[in-house]
């Protein structure tokens, strides 16, 4: 009887072992060499590079740097190099808010205007949780400041963000009904935390998160001029070869501006696996998907992107600002965490993270796309055209170029893999053209397969512009960004100019609707008389701002 019992126990143990993925069974030296090989293109003293760190069961197994932290001074990247990690910052801001909630000082269900009374009342309650989960409907701060005249290399501060948000008279959508990635919410959270805690987010996080976890090389960077020893500079490629310095100029934080090392970040990720700070309930909140009012899961927790890879659960985040690129992923089923920071705008650390994980999990890279399907060129041409979303007011333009369907200006083609289904390179984006009903306009449904959210629907529209372009010329003022836009017709095309920005061409996409690189979708509006009385403009993340046409000298406004 004892032998049967022992056999049963052995079989049970084998089943449990088989059910849990095991790490690659190879000597550490061989495993580390395979990791090094992944970063071969980023080695040497003439290129920026990356830092990588891998932990297993909370202990660092491997950490190394590749390439240069400073091309000017020949300083190499090491695991101790400090990087700006951009949106990886968000999980710390959400956690800090959660710590204050544990103390009863705020609630995630509070209206944000309880703490930010200077913001307008949009007629719908926006909660702190909406800020955390990207469901607030607030417009994107960076896009708004650009529309207000800030250039990409201008200093942007918390006061600038509060100024432009206080001017807004509309939302992208009703709070809780959509998910749209948004930096504004996390910058506002940093202000709320400061007002509630009585100290800056930088000081609060240092006291309550970084110091207890031994993250000695981590801080929220709230002064762009502050000298940070061991900081890696960041770069973007120059036309014709070489590199340009590309560092962000921010004094706002919460949404970004965390400075840290790969080793410090893995100390934090270990806390999300086995909490030492904050407790299990708070960590669970970070790792739980938000849901919309419709009941749909967003796939985004509190500052963490949730997903699966190689059949395992994952959580983590990516970051990108100026020339800095970063990614971290945790595989809780295997107690594995991988962090990769790079200081070149052309690096893709998320791909490195997955490839390093494959080394440790003993898995092959997941196939990203199916085999291409042969589609007649005439059929592809039939899909080309201009498509518009009534929900987001955004436009996609598809063209047939070099025998392939692609978005206008895009390098990567849409690859057909099934009838009516196209994939885009190595991304998780898919474009589906459903069968048309008789006389119905053609649609394209664009979806991120890594997300639980539904596809965005675009309908094909007539790209014919209005016959009298000169009627669009004039000046238009938007109170929401305190800016006057001048429209002129040059070389047969409308062009827009505003303070401190380059002229941008308006490309016709149907009637009074145009698109531009800087202002997104621009739609001229008309009074009952038929005369142009204003325009709306906006991007996916800052939709439908309004500008009123200013009367020409000596003329009254049309009604």
Regions found by a protein language model. Name each.
Residues 8-18:
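Bacterial N-terminal signal peptides
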Residues 45-49, 322-325, 392, 481, ...:
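Short, small/polar residue-rich loop motifs at catalytic or cofactor-binding pockets
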Residues 316-317, 327-344, 442-447, 534-536:
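Short, well-ordered beta-strand elements
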């Amino acid at each position: 009887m004892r032998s049967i019992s022992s056999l049963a126990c052995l079989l049970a143990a084998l089943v449990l072992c088989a059910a849990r993925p095991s790490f690659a069974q190879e000597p550490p030296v061989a495993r580390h060499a395979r990791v090094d090989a992944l970063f071969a293109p980023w080695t040497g003293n003439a290129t920026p590079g990356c830092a990588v760190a891998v932990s297993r069961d909370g202990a660092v197994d491997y950490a190394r740097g590749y390439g240069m932290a400073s091309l000017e001074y020949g300083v190499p990247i090491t695991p101790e190099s400090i990087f700006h990690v951009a949106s990886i910052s968000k999980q710390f801001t959400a956690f800090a808010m959660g710590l204050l909630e544990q103390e009863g000082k705020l609630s995630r269900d509070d209206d944000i205007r309880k703490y930010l009374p200077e913001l307008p009342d949009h007629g719908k309650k926006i909660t702190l949780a909406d800020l955390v989960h990207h469901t607030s409907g607030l417009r994107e701060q960076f896009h708004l400041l650009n529309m207000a005249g800030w250039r990409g290399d201008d200093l942007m501060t918390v006061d600038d963000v509060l100024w432009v948000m206080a001017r807004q008279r509309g939302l992208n959508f009703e709070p809780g009904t959509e998910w749209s990635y948004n930096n504004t919410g996390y910058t506002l959270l940093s202000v709320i935390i400061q007002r509630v805690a009585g100290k800056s987010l930088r000081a609060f996080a240092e006291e309550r998160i970084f110091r207890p976890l031994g993250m000695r090389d981590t801080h929220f960077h709230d002064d762009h001029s502050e000298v940070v020893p061991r900081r890696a500079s960041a770069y973007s490629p120059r036309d014709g070869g070489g590199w340009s310095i590309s560092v962000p100029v921010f004094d706002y934080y919460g949404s970004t501006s965390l400075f840290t090392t790969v080793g410090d970040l893995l100390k934090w990720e270990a806390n999300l696996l086995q909490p030492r700070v904050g407790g299990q309930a708070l960590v669970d909140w970070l790792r739980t998907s938000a849901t919309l009012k419709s009941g749909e899961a967003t796939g985004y927790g509190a500052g963490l992107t949730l997903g699966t890879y190689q059949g395992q659960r994952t959580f983590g985040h990516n970051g990108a600002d100026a020339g800095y690129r970063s990614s971290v992923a945790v595989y809780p089923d295997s107690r594995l965490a991988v962090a990769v920071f790079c200081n070149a705008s052309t690096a893709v650390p998320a791909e490195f993270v997955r490839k390093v994980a494959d080394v440790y999990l003993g898995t092959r890279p997941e196939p990203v796309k199916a085999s291409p399907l042969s589609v007649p060129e005439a059929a592809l041409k039939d899909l080309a055209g201009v498509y518009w979303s009534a929900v987001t007011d955004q436009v996609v333009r598809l063209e047939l170029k070099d025998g392939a369907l692609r978005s206008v200006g895009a390098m990567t083609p849409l690859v057909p893999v099934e009838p009516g289904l196209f994939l885009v390179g190595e991304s998780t984006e898919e474009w589906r053209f459903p069968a048309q009903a008789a006389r119905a306009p053609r649609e394209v449904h664009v979806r991120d397969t890594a997300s639980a959210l539904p596809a965005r629907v675009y309908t094909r529209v007539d790209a014919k512009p209005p016959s009298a372009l000169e009627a669009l010329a004039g000046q238009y003022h938007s109170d929401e960004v305190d800016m006057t836009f001048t429209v002129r017709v040059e070389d047969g095309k409308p062009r827009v100019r505003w303070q401190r920005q380059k002229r941008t061409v308006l490309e016709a996409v149907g009637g009074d609707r145009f698109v531009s690189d800087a202002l997104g979708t621009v739609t001229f509006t008309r009074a009952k008389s038929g005369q142009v009385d204003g325009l709306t403009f906006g991007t996916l993340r800052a939709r439908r701002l309004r500008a009123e046409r200013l009367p020409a000298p000596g003329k009254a406004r049309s009604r």
